[in-house]
Amino acid sequence: AHIETDECGAPEFFWNGTKILLAQGKNGKLDPAAIEEVARRRTDIHYPKPRVVSLTQATELGTVYAAEEIREIGALARRLGLRVHMDGARLCNALATLGCAPAEITWRAGVDTLCFGMTKNGILAGEAVVFFDRELAQEFDYRCKQAGQLASKMRFLSAPWPVMLRGGAALRNARRANECAARLEAGIRALAELKVLHPREANSVFVEMP
């Protein structure tokens, strides 16, 4: 997961010492049974208390959760008293693959908070944090300021979003990126000495080279 390996410990730093616990899965996807095992592993005071499940759509390995997979995780999280966060840096690529409405793989599937990225689809900088449960957004503006996430010219970071979303450019760009990745994958599979490591379901291809 990106929050574990590629953020220099920032999530745990800004969460005042919160501990990230890792659950296993195949091809970058969290396994519901593994989530439950981590959540129920221990209940004593010496062990971190699970509070939220974070999943990435599309995943760090280029795979995509189907809507029913996210619904299963969402339902499990509710039973365990956990919230659900989605890292959507490549959400548009996942939507282009699935051909569904955004709601089907976010709030209707049990996602509470979405980090919606657009830099993979043409925007220079910035992400949108979407709270489907508004209670979780309490004083979020203050936390953004403390974390250095309030740009002095925030309007310039925000301006491209309506154009990208209303005009359909985000999905068009995502489809194009997925198509290019599929073309690359096909070329790689034609070379016997190269091996594609994971199913290519979005715009990422992972290859083992000699």
Tell where the protein language model's regions lie, with residue ranges.
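Conserved PLP-enzyme active-site core in the AAT-like
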Residues: 1-210
